[in-house]
Regions:
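Short, contiguous clusters of charged residues that form electrostatic/catalytic patches at enzyme active sites
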Residues: 28, 72, 121-124, 170-177
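Electropositive nucleic-acid engagement tracts
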Residues: 18-22, 28, 32-101, 200, ...
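Structural motif
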Residues: 18-25, 113-119
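An anionic, glycine-rich sequence signature occurring as long contiguous blocks
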Residues: 7, 132-157, 161, 165, ...
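Domain-level cores of phosphate- or acyl-group-handling catalytic modules
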Residues: 153-232
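Short, glycine/acidic-rich beta->alpha junctions
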Residues: 37, 70, 118, 192-196, ...
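Basic, low-complexity segments
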Residues: 1-18
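Active-site-proximal, Lys/Arg-enriched surface segment
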Residues: 62-145, 277-291, 296
């Protein structure tokens, strides 16, 4: 059974917990979240598995155990099994709809699964992909500012004092920095939630990372190949010279596009029309001083 295989896989990680009862609670909770329960909180899980409620609550919310050694072991295992110098680190957010309001970080925020703002928790995840396979290697729970500032909420859910508000970009950079030291990789990729913010791109630059990031079509860019000369000494191109990516694309000549063979599909070769140019970006009232490749 899949559950038995998962328990076997998880055993070395539970073994890192300092006490026997912690290992047992961990195994029970893992089993509980894989059930068909509508509400997969502590109470329904304890009832379904016939476990005492309070010990399981204490294990999840108050007991002082460090999850970092488990993630470190997972990362080492991934390196052994999937590591490749051409590997890719994948940053991806995911939201989890919640019916209640007591779980840590629950707030009315964008939920991609529902396609709208709703009551949910948001996690930032880091995956690893190589030609040998793919898996998740790290995660961070996004704590909204309203939670980070609330002493009452923090105390009720036992949020550690060291945890402060950080943007999703800051959380992602932290994971890339920590796991990138262990996992061999050539690229970092992410969707437009991370491709748009200037600070995320700048953070990757500072770490010396190569990256491929999705950006929104309304991001302002300056095509350096078409930049007009600017007389006199200036601090850089004026804001008025920048245009949205979609407008820049619409103004290209047919000769600017190149047919690119992506892969062979079941119905024959998959080809796209693509183009690229060096640009500077302008977003969040900030102009990037570094030029980057824009690929469309």
């Amino acid at each position: 059974m899949a559950l038995e295989r998962l328990k076997e896989f998880a055993q070395p990680y539970f073994a890192l917990m300092p006490r026997v009862e912690m290992r047992q609670h961990g195994a029970h909770f893992l089993e509980g979240i894989l059930t068909d329960l509508e509400r997969k909180s502590v109470e329904p899980i304890a009832e379904r598995l016939g476990e005492s409620l309070r010990p399981l609550q204490y294990f999840l919310g108050e007991s002082p155990w460090d999850h970092q050694p488990l993630l470190d072991k997972l990362c080492q295992r991934v390196r052994e099994c999937l590591g490749d110098e051409n590997g890719v680190l994948v940053v991806d957010p995911s939201a989890f709809p919640k019916k209640g309001t007591q779980s840590v970080g629950v707030a009315r925020q964008w939920c991609g699964r529902l396609g709208k703002k709703d009551n949910c928790q948001v996690g930032i995840f880091l995956g690893y992909v190589s030609n040998k396979g793919h898996t998740l290697v790290d995660e961070r729970l996004y704590l909204p500012a309203v939670w980070a500032r609330s002493k009452t909420r923090r105390e009720k859910c036992a949020v550690p004092k060291s945890v402060r508000f950080r943007t999703s970009s800051q959380l992602a950079l932290e994971m890339v920095r920590e796991r990138g030291r262990i996992l061999p990789h050539r690229w970092v990729v992410a969707d437009e939630e991370f491709g748009q913010p200037y600070r995320f791109r700048k953070g990757l630059d500072r770490m010396g990372e190569r990256y491929l990031l999705e950006i929104p079509s309304n991001l302002l860019v300056l095509d350096l190949a078409k930049m007009p000369s600017v007389d006199g000494k200036t601090n850089g191109p004026r804001r008025a010279l920048f245009q949205q990516v979609r407008r820049w694309k619409d103004g290209l000549r047919p000769s600017s596009w190149t047919k690119v063979h992506i892969r062979d599909g079941t119905k024959g070769p998959l080809k796209i029309m693509a183009t690229r140019t060096r640009v500077q970006s302008y977003d969040m009232r900030r102009q990037s001083k570094k030029s980057q490749w824009l690929m469309v």
